[in-house]
């Protein structure tokens, strides 16, 4: 199918219901980056020449063939520097492609939420995963919502939080008071899920004392069930529980996979998150990769 003229000021945009009739084919050109022959077009109204590649998000990329490899490496526990070494490119190339892929993944994640039937989800699991930026004195909480049937990630929000326990005094002394942004993240996450979750859906969480008030604010008729947390089956990996039956297995298993497949979330690693924005971009990328490739193709909420 012929594309329409990309010029928004072209007269063909107002030439009836189908502006594609104002475009004609005009040969091909050879693209050296991936060895493809790309079709050229010409608009009969403004005489502008353009190609089918001009409408793609990878327009003018020189190494577009590396996009899928960067995606697979960064969602398989490989760091950005090691990805650059394995692919034989400059580390800055991997950083640029990481940011590009994260932007595309964010759009894909929004499309997935729109594809879910309105208020069709009757069960949701919700919990927080904790990590840090630069140092453990700067913790970050990632609120995560998962469909227990398909195990697809429905949404997340990463928020800064103050340090707890023995690190709290050291954190205040070195970096000053740290604002707790988790309430804002919880409100944003629940607000994002309002169109697709049934008002009387069953929400399963741990016994966090803060969850009920925020759940009541966005889903006043929802059924809220809690389950006590348990010890991790492996020291330092609290996501996988030691007890025999885990009611929140879908969410805990998702968190365990996040720690296994995202290098910056490893328990013992020097590839720590440097900025909150970088963590959010990586989570967007992995969420799309998981929902697309690592979870079964089931209808959301179908058990």
Residue spans of the language-model regions?
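Residue-level recognition of single "structural anchor" positions
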Residues: 1-303
């Amino acid at each position: 199918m012929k594309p329409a003229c990309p010029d928004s000021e072209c007269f063909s945009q107002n030439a009836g219901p189908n502006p594609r009739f104002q475009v004609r084919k005009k040969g091909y050109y050879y693209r050296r980056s991936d060895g493809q022959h790309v079709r050229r077009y010409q608009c009969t109204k403004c005489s502008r020449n353009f190609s089918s590649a001009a409408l793609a998000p990878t327009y003018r990329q020189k190494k577009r063939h590396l996009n899928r490899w960067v995606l697979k490496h960064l969602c398989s526990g490989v760091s950005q520097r090691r990805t650059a070494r394995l692919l034989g490119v400059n580390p800055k190339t991997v950083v640029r492609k990481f940011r590009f892929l994260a932007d595309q993944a964010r759009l894909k994640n929004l499309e997935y939420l729109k594809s879910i039937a309105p208020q069709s989800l009757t069960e949701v699991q919700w919990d927080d995963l904790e990590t840090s930026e630069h140092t453990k004195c700067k913790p970050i909480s990632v609120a995560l919502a998962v469909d227990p049937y398909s195990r697809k990630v429905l949404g997340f929000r990463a928020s800064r939080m103050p340090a707890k326990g023995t690190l709290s005094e050291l954190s205040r002394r070195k970096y000053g008071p740290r604002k707790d942004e988790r309430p804002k993240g919880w409100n944003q996450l629940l607000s994002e899920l309002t169109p697709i979750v049934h008002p009387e859906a069953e929400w399963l969480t741990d016994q966090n004392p803060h969850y009920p008030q925020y759940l009541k604010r966005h889903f006043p008729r929802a059924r809220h069930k809690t389950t006590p947390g348990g010890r991790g089956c492996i020291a330092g990996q609290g996501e996988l529980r030691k007890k025999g039956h885990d009611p929140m297995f879908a969410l805990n298993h998702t968190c365990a996979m996040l720690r296994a497949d995202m290098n910056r979330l490893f328990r013992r690693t020097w590839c720590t998150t440097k900025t909150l924005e970088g963590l959010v971009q990586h989570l967007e990328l992995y969420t799309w990769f998981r929902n697309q490739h690592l979870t079964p193709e089931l209808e959301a909420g179908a058990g």
